[in-house]
C-alpha cells in the first residue's frame, strides 16, 4: 500500500505545473484554484471584477471547463488584492527565467535555441492577441507588412462604459450650444449637400454620361482639373479674403481654429487671415463638398498644414451632423406629430460612422486626435472630456529613447518615420458636443481612424466567416492621407477598402429607418461621399483610384502641376545617364517586355568581369523575384537585398558587393524606402524601372561618390523606360525633355550630370 501510495503521489506531482509545485512547496497545499471538484457540470457563475482593474488574466482552454465555484472563489473575485496579482507576475517571470536558463544551458552544450522558439510559439498560439491576428488572410504573403513596422497588434480594446453618454438616440441638444444658426441658413454647404435630392434619371445617366472637364488656374494650387459626370458643372473662383463667419463653422470652431492654426501664421498674415494661402484654397474646395486629389503633400514641407485644415473640415462636418440629429430628437420630444411628418426628421445614414480617415502610422492617428481635442477645446478654460486618453497615448505614442541617437538619415525620411510607426491599427472616435470618446465601438463611432492593414484585417475576404464592412456603408467623408506610403506598404489593401465603401449593410444594426435619409436607403451614398486624397507624387495607381472610385455629385478637383525640372538636376556626381526606351504593345505587356529587353539587350553588356560592381535598382518586388530566379538559373555571380532580407544578410551582401566578390547587387525600392542605407562600391547603375519617388533617382546616383577611388571615368548609369512611364519620366528629367524623349524616333537618349 505504501508503494502504491507513493507511486500515485509521484504521478500526481508529475501532472502539476511549475506554478502548482511552487505553491505546494511554499504553502504545503495546492492553490484552491486547482481543487479537484465533482465532474458533474454545473451552470457557470459569472463574478464581476472591480472596474478599477485595467486588465484581466484570461484562463487557458484547459482551465476554462465549467466548475463549481466555491464561496472562497467568489470572495477572491471581489477582493481588490494587488499583492496576489504581483505574486503571480513574479511566478511568471521566474518561469520565463527558468526557460531562458535552460536555453542558455542548451547553447553551452552545443544545442540550438529551438526549445525557446517552440516555447514562444506555443505561448503565441495561446494568446488571444495572436488568435485575433491569425484572421488576417494575407498575413503570410509577400508584400504584406514591410520592415520597420510592427507585425502584431495589441489586443483590441473598445470602450463599453460610455455608450449611453455618447448615444445619438437618447441625447438631446443642449441649450447652451444652441441650434446653430448656420444649420438653419439655406446657404450652409453642409445642408445644401445632404439635403440635395438626386433623381433616378440622373443616377442612370451617370453610367453613360461623358465626363466634362474644366481647366482652372489658382494662385497657390496651380493647375486644377475640375470634372463631373453630372450635367451641371459650376465653376468656382479662387478665394480672396475669407471671413470665418462666412464659412458656416459650427461652434466652437470659429474661436478655436485661430489658436490651433497659429503655428502656421506669421507676420501680417496672422492678423488678416486665419488660414495660410494653401489652407485657404484647400478649405474652399473641401467646404464645397467636392472630391479633391492633391499630389503635393510632403511630410517635410506642408504635411501638418494640410492635416490641420482637413481636421477642421472633419470636426465641422461631425458637429453639424450630430447637432442636426440631436436637434431633431428635441423636436420629436417636444411636439406631437403624425405618421406623415416622419420625413422631416430624416437626418442619418444606415450606420453611425460618417468619417473615415486612413493614415499610414499610429503617429499620424495620434496627431489627428490631438488636433480634434485642440479644435474642441481652444482657449476655453473648461476642459473637454476625453475618455480613455491615457490608454490612447500609451498605445499610439512613442518613447523618444527608443530611437537611436546616432541614426543619420535624410530629412524627408526623418519626417515620415517619426514617432510610433506601427501600421496595424484601427480606432473609433465618438464626438458629442464637447466630449470625445476614444476606442468607441465602430457602430457607435462618428469617426474611424485606421491604417489600410487595420481595415483589411476586419473587412476580410470572400469566403471568410468573420468579416465585417457594414460600418463603411454610410461614410460621408473619406480622407486618404499620405497615399504614396501605401504604395510602399500594400496597395491591394487600399483597393480592397475602396471596393467595400458605401455598400448596403448586411444587418440593420438597430437603425431607426424612419430617420434614415432617402438617398442612403436608395444605395446612393457613394454619390454623396466626399473623398479627399493627399499624396506626395503623381502616380498612375493613385490616379486610377481617384478616377474610378470618386463619383461625388458635386464633382472632382485634381491638382495637376507638371514638374518643369526633374530630380536629375540634383545628381551631384559626374555621370552619363543613358535612357533606353523599350517598346510595348499595351500596358498589360509592359512587365514581360521590360524583362525580355533587360535580359536580351542590357544584361549581356554587363556580363563581362570589367563591368563589376553593378547595382540593379528594382521598384517592384515581383520583378525582383523574377530577376533573382533568372540570375540563379544562369548561375550569375550576384547578391541581393530586399525588404525581407535579414540584417545579417544585408551586411554580408553589402560587404561582398563592396569587395567585388559579387558582380551584381539586386536592390529593391521598398528596402531603400524603409532603410535608406548608403550602398558603397557602386560603379555601374541600372534602373530596371524608373523610381516611384523621383528624389530616389538622385539619391541612388549620388551613392557612387560614397567610395571615390578615382574611377569616375568608368561610371555608368542605364535607365529603362516605356511610353507608359510618362509621369515618372517627367518627374526625373522634366516635362519638356520627357515629351521629346517619348515622341522622338530615337530609342536612346544621353544626359550627363556633374559637368564643371
UniProtKB/Swiss-Prot annotation:
GO CC annotation terms, alphabetical: nucleolus; nucleoplasm; small-subunit processome
GO biological process: embryonic organ development; maturation of SSU-rRNA from tricistronic rRNA transcript (SSU-rRNA, 5.8S rRNA, LSU-rRNA); positive regulation of embryonic development; protein catabolic process; protein destabilization; protein localization to nucleolus
Residues recorded with modification Phosphoserine: 10, 50, 52, 58, 60, 62, 64
Main location, first listed in the record: nucleus
GO molecular function: RNA binding; rRNA binding; U3 snoRNA binding
Sorted UniProt keywords: Developmental protein, Nucleus, Phosphoprotein
Compositionally skewed regions (Acidic residues) per UniProt: 54-64, 84-121
Keyword Phosphoprotein: yes
Region feature (Promotes p53/TP53 degradation): 1-185, 573-635
PTM comment: Phosphorylated. Phosphorylation is required to promote p53/TP53 degradation in the nucleolus which promotes cell cycle progression and liver development.
Compartments it resides in: Nucleus, Nucleolus
Induction line: Down-regulated by the miRNA MIR195.
Subunit structure of this chain's protein: Interacts with CAPN3; the interaction is required for CAPN3 translocation to the nucleolus.
Family that this chain belongs to: Belongs to the UTP25 family.
UniProt-recorded name of the protein: U3 small nucleolar RNA-associated protein 25 homolog
Origin organism lineage: Eukaryota, Metazoa, Chordata, Craniata, Vertebrata
GN (gene name): UTP25
Amino acid at each position: 500500500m505504501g508503494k502504491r501510495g507513493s507511486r500515485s503521489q509521484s504521478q500526481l506531482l508529475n501532472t502539476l505545473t511549475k506554478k502548482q509545485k511552487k505553491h505546494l512547496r511554499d504553502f504545503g497545499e495546492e492553490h484552491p484554484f486547482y481543487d479537484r471538484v465533482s465532474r458533474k457540470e454545473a451552470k457557470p457563475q459569472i463574478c464581476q471584477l472591480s472596474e478599477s482593474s485595467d486588465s484581466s488574466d484570461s484562463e487557458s482552454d484547459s482551465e476554462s471547463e465549467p466548475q463549481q465555484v466555491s464561496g472562497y472563489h467568489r470572495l477572491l473575485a471581489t477582493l481588490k488584492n494587488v499583492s496576489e496579482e504581483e505574486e503571480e507576475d513574479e511566478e511568471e517571470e521566474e518561469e520565463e527565467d527558468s526557460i531562458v536558463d535552460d536555453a542558455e544551458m542548451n547553447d553551452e552544450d552545443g544545442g540550438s535555441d529551438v526549445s525557446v522558439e517552440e516555447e514562444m510559439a506555443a505561448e503565441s498560439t495561446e494568446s488571444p492577441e495572436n488568435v485575433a491576428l491569425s484572421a488576417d488572410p494575407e498575413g503570410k504573403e509577400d508584400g504584406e507588412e514591410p520592415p520597420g513596422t510592427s507585425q502584431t497588434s495589441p489586443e483590441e480594446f473598445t470602450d463599453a462604459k460610455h455608450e449611453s453618454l455618447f448615444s445619438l438616440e437618447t441625447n438631446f441638444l443642449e441649450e447652451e450650444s444652441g441650434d446653430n444658426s448656420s444649420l438653419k441658413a439655406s446657404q450652409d454647404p453642409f445642408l445644401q449637400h445632404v439635403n440635395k435630392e438626386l433623381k433616378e434619371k440622373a443616377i442612370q445617366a451617370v453610367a453613360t454620361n461623358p465626363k466634362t472637364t474644366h481647366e482652372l488656374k489658382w494662385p497657390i494650387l496651380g493647375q486644377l482639373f475640375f470634372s463631373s459626370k453630372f450635367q451641371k458643372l459650376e465653376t468656382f473662383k479662387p478665394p480672396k479674403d475669407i471671413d470665418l463667419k462666412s464659412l458656416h463653422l459650427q461652434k466652437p470652431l470659429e474661436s478655436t481654429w485661430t489658436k490651433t492654426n497659429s503655428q502656421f501664421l506669421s507676420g501680417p498674415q496672422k492678423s488678416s487671415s486665419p488660414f495660410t494661402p494653401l489652407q485657404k484654397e484647400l478649405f474652399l474646395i473641401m467646404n464645397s463638398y467636392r472630391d479633391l486629389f492633391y499630389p503635393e503633400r510632403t511630410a517635410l514641407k506642408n504635411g501638418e498644414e494640410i492635416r490641420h485644415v482637413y481636421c477642421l473640415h472633419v470636426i465641422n462636418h461631425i458637429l453639424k451632423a450630430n447637432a442636426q440629429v440631436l436637434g431633431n430628437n428635441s423636436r420629436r420630444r417636444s411636439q406631437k406629430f403624425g405618421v406623415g411628418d416622419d420625413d422631416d426628421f430624416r437626418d442619418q445614414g444606415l450606420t453611425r460612422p460618417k468619417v473615415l480617415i486612413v493614415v499610414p502610422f499610429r503617429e499620424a492617428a495620434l496627431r489627428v486626435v490631438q488636433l480634434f481635442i485642440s479644435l474642441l477645446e481652444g482657449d476655453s478654460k473648461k476642459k473637454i472630456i476625453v475618455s480613455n486618453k491615457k490608454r490612447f497615448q500609451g498605445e499610439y505614442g512613442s518613447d523618444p529613447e527608443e530611437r537611436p541617437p546616432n541614426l543619420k538619415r535624410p530629412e524627408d525620411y526623418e519626417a515620415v518615420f517619426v514617432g510610433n510607426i506601427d501600421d496595424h491599427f484601427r480606432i473609433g472616435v465618438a464626438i458629442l458636443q464637447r466630449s470625445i470618446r476614444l476606442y468607441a465601438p465602430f457602430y457607435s463611432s462618428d469617426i474611424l481612424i485606421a491604417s489600410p492593414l487595420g481595415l483589411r484585417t476586419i473587412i476580410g475576404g470572400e469566403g471568410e466567416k468573420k468579416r465585417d464592412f457594414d460600418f463603411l456603408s454610410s461614410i460621408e467623408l473619406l480622407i486618404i492621407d499620405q497615399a504614396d506610403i501605401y504604395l510602399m506598404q500594400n496597395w491591394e489593401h487600399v483597393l480592397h477598402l475602396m471596393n467595400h465603401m458605401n455598400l448596403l449593410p448586411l444587418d440593420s444594426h438597430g437603425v431607426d429607418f424612419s430617420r434614415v435619409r432617402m438617398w442612403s436607403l436608395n444605395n446612393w451614398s457613394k454619390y454623396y461621399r466626399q473623398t479627399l486624397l493627399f499624396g506626395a507624387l503623381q502616380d498612375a495607381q493613385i490616379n486610377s483610384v481617384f478616377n474610378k472610385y470618386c463619383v461625388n455629385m458635386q464633382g472632382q478637383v485634381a491638382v495637376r502641376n507638371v514638374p518643369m525640372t526633374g530630380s536629375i538636376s540634383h545628381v551631384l556626381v559626374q555621370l552619363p545617364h543613358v535612357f533606353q526606351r523599350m517598346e510595348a504593345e499595351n500596358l498589360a505587356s509592359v512587365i514581360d517586355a521590360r524583362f525580355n529587353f533587360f535580359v536580351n539587350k542590357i544584361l549581356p553588356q554587363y556580363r563581362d568581369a570589367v563591368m563589376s560592381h553593378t547595382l540593379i535598382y528594382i521598384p517592384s518586388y515581383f520583378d525582383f523575384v523574377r530577376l533573382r530566379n533568372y540570375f540563379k538559373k544562369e548561375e550569375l555571380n550576384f547578391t541581393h537585398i530586399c525588404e525581407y532580407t535579414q540584417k545579417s544578410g544585408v551586411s554580408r551582401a553589402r560587404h561582398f558587393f563592396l569587395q567585388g566578390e559579387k558582380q551584381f547587387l539586386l536592390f529593391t525600392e521598398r528596402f531603400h524606402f524603409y532603410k535608406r542605407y548608403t550602398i558603397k562600391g557602386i560603379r555601374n547603375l541600372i534602373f530596371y524601372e524608373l523610381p516611384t519617388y523621383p528624389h530616389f533617382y538622385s539619391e541612388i546616383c549620388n551613392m557612387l561618390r560614397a567610395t571615390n577611388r578615382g574611377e569616375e571615368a568608368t561610371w555608368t548609369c542605364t535607365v529603362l523606360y516605356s511610353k507608359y512611364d510618362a509621369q515618372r519620366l517627367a518627374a526625373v528629367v522634366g516635362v519638356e525633355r520627357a515629351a521629346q524623349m517619348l515622341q522622338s524616333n530615337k530609342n536612346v537618349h544621353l544626359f550627363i550630370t556633374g559637368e564643371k
